[in-house]
Curated annotation (Swiss-Prot):
The protein's assembly and partners: Heterohexamer of 3 UreA (alpha) and 3 UreB (beta) subunits.
Region (Urease beta): 91-213
UniProt-recorded name of the protein: Urease subunit alpha
Matching SUPFAM superfamilies: Urease, beta-subunit (SSF51278), Urease, gamma-subunit (SSF54111)
Location of this chain's protein in the cell: Cytoplasm
EC number: 3.5.1.5
Keyword Cell inner membrane: no
Organism: Helicobacter mustelae
UniProt pathway: Nitrogen metabolism; urea degradation; CO(2) and NH(3) from urea (urease route): step 1/1
Length: 213
């Protein structure tokens, strides 16, 4: 234990963040050595054990793992058990896998004006549209007023989608694309900035390729 503690101490002095085993070994060694001197009480050593390491001295998550350190140490008058609860002060950082949730609900796409549009699937297979797909360029078997939906996407959470079953009609909400509003790819109807000039080109391409009849 003493050797492991000394090794951990040297690593700490070099700026190496300690792992779980090293942290426990260093705290235990410090308590053990001060107990041997006979100048401190059990209460003193419990306090000392919480001063050996800080959260920045250990690897992420170690402070949360070390709930307590218990060690039987030799005092001049015999062996006593020293227990140190939460020996490594947490600096408020997130623990691995931890979630911190807000008390209030999160408003999706807050501040963005949404419009509603009725969409019908005229095909014989389901059609699924992702959150950031340029709705103007969706499958040509989806029937809706495409011209007025240029530069818009679904008003749903990022990474989710809406599924249109064969023959189904449903109303969805659309919002303008954010950011720089540069749209590329999809069905190759618009490749560039969302503006009136590119809208005219996109409409012409949509009519030529059968997206608008």
């Amino acid at each position: 234990l003493h050797y492991a503690g000394e090794l951990a101490k040297k690593r700490k002095e070099r700026g190496v963040k300690l792992n779980y085993v090293e942290a426990v070994a260093l705290i235990s060694m410090e308590i053990m050595e001060h107990a041997r001197e006979g100048k401190k009480t059990v209460a003193d050593l419990m306090s000392l054990g919480r001063q050996v390491l800080k959260a920045e001295d250990v690897m992420d998550g170690v402070a949360a793992l070390v709930h307590e350190v218990q060690i039987e140490v030799c005092f001049p008058d015999g062996t006593l058990l020293v227990t140190v609860h939460n020996p490594i002060e947490n600096n408020g950082k997130l623990h691995p896998g931890e979630f911190i949730l807000k008390d209030e609900d999160i408003v999706l796409n807050a501040g963005k004006e949404a419009i509603e549009v009725k969409v019908s699937n005229k095909g014989d297979r389901p059609i699924q549209v992702g959150s950031h797909f340029h709705f103007f360029e969706t499958n040509k078997l989806l029937e809706f007023d495409r011209e007025k939906r240029y530069g818009r996407r679904l008003d749903i959470a990022s990474g989710t989608s809406v599924r249109f079953e064969p023959g189904e009609s449903k109303t969805v909400r659309l919002i303008q694309f954010g950011g720089n509003q540069r749209i590329f790819g999809f069905n190759d109807l618009n490749n560039g900035q969302v503006n009136e000039d590119n809208k005219r080109k996109a409409l012409a391409a949509a009519k030529a390729k059968g997206f608008i009849k």
